[in-house]
């Protein structure tokens, strides 16, 4: 059976640009990377996380002061993979603007709210979902106990991150994340996960640059 990701990548359009050396072709994502646009699309896992972190580090090396734009449409995924992206976002010098299109669930919502203050957006019909981490393990009783302790520590750490970026108190975050909690873009704004709901691009801001 063909890998669905491979199938999608084979359908990625190419963009042809004219340069003083002739024509140059880029896949659409590479071309957008030149504009400092990164996509977090699909499940968050190690391979995707590595690529996103590499792009963040590359754009920092290219210009340590210019804003990076991260577009998110993700159902979430592996916590450690998401934390690698989160830590890299906090580590690099350029501010990272985040925008949710479609959905930002689980780790996707954490990456959304981790954007630079004042630069966290969601499109009008985006859906945001927050919850506590989940996992399963089989083995000896003592090993299961250790894994349970570890996931509880991870839950506390994730709660602390949401507290930091939303301004909500710890108890509110813990209650909200106790079960799957779905929000509209407006509800995410009111909760403090984002700073603005956007329906159309601000043309006046682009023209003033």
UniProtKB/Swiss-Prot annotation:
UniProt cross-references to InterPro entries, sorted A to Z: ClpP (IPR001907), ClpP/crotonase-like_dom_sf (IPR029045), ClpP/TepA (IPR023562), ClpP_Ser_AS (IPR018215)
Location of the active site: 106 (nucleophile), 131
EC number: 3.4.21.92
GO MF term list: ATP-dependent peptidase activity; ATPase binding; serine-type endopeptidase activity
Domain of life: Bacteria
PANTHER family: ATP-DEPENDENT CLP PROTEASE PROTEOLYTIC SUBUNIT
Protein name: ATP-dependent Clp protease proteolytic subunit
Organism: Brucella melitensis biotype 2 (strain ATCC 23457)
Gene: clpP
């Amino acid at each position: 059976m063909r890998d669905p990701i491979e199938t999608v990548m084979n359908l990625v359009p190419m963009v042809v640009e004219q340069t003083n050396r002739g024509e140059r072709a880029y896949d659409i994502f590479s071309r957008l990377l030149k504009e400092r646009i990164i996509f977090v699309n699909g499940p968050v896992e190690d391979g995707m996380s590595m690529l996103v972190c590499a792009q963040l580090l590359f754009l920092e090396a290219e210009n340590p002061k210019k804003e990076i734009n991260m577009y998110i449409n993700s159902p979430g995924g592996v916590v450690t993979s998401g934390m690698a992206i989160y830590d890299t976002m906090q580590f690099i010098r350029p501010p990272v603007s985040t925008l949710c299109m479609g959905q930002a669930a689980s780790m996707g919502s954490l990456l959304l709210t981790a954007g630079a203050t004042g630069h966290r957006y969601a499109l009008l019909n985006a859906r945001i979902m927050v919850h506590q981490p989940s996992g399963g393990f089989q083995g000896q009783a003592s090993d299961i106990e250790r894994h349970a302790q570890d996931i509880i520590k991870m839950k506390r750490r994730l709660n602390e991150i949401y507290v930091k970026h939303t301004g909500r108190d710890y108890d509110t975050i813990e209650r909200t994340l106790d079960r799957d909690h779905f929000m509209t873009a407006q509800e995410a704004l009111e909760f403090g996960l984002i700073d603005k709901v956007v329906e159309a691009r601000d043309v006046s801001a682009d023209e003033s640059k």
